Amino acid sequence: MNSIGMMIDVSHVSDDTFFDIVKISNKPIIASHSSPRVLTPGFERNLSDEMIELIAKTNGVILINFGSSFVNSKSNKIFTDINDDVEKWRVEKKLKSDDKEVEEYRDQLINKLNPFADIEDVLDAIDHVYNLVGDDYIGFGSDYDGLGNTLPKNLKDVSTYINLIEGLIKRAYSKESIEKICYKNFFRAWNANLQNHQI
């Protein structure tokens, strides 16, 4: 992948695969939609502090996932319970996973339990990476196209990005840091992967 200018994304890979990639790659790697594991203990889809530090050492970027289950341990537990309940109900009703009734039942449980994280949890995720490795290795991964009805309050779609920027300003992030987080860090990693390659 390095040899053809293809960026390597470690979101969704196992820990073993992650460490293999870090050993082999000679270009910046990214986690396109992951958050710090320390915020959601036991949720291995997120990144350990060691992984975050190793991505930074490649000059890569950790693009923060906004999903409630990715940034808040209580939300993670509730959504796990909801998914388990929905699957049990689906089997009992002999329905397919993509049947409309299944989604309606899931929405009923979500509306009842209100398991959503808050935008502050996303800002905490950004703070954690910042405190660990600095502002050169953070970006927004959102995962708007993959999360469905699990996004935090005040961060439901791209029109609410301004809330995130305002949150960063309130937490005393500089204009330069915010620009890095919004786009400059990702562009740097992208361009480093494309260096010496024609597209």
Question: PLM ranges: what are they?
Answer:
Residues I64-S69, V133-L155:
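Short acidic/histidine-rich active-site segments
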Residues E101-D127, E176-W190:
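C-terminal helical cap
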Residues V13-F19, P36-L39, S69-N72, G146-G148:
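Active-site environment of divalent metal-dependent phosphoester hydrolases
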Residues M1-I30, E44-G60, D121-D136:
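Histidine/acidic residue-rich metal-binding segments in metalloenzymes
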Residues I8, A31-H33, I62, D143, ...:
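Conserved, mostly hydrophobic/aromatic
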Residues K156-I199:
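Mid-to-C-terminal alpha-helical segments outside catalytic/metal-binding sites
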Residues S48-E104:
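Aromatic-lined glycan-binding groove of carbohydrate-active enzymes
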Residues P28-V38:
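Acidic, His- and aromatic-enriched active-site or binding-groove loops in soluble protein domains
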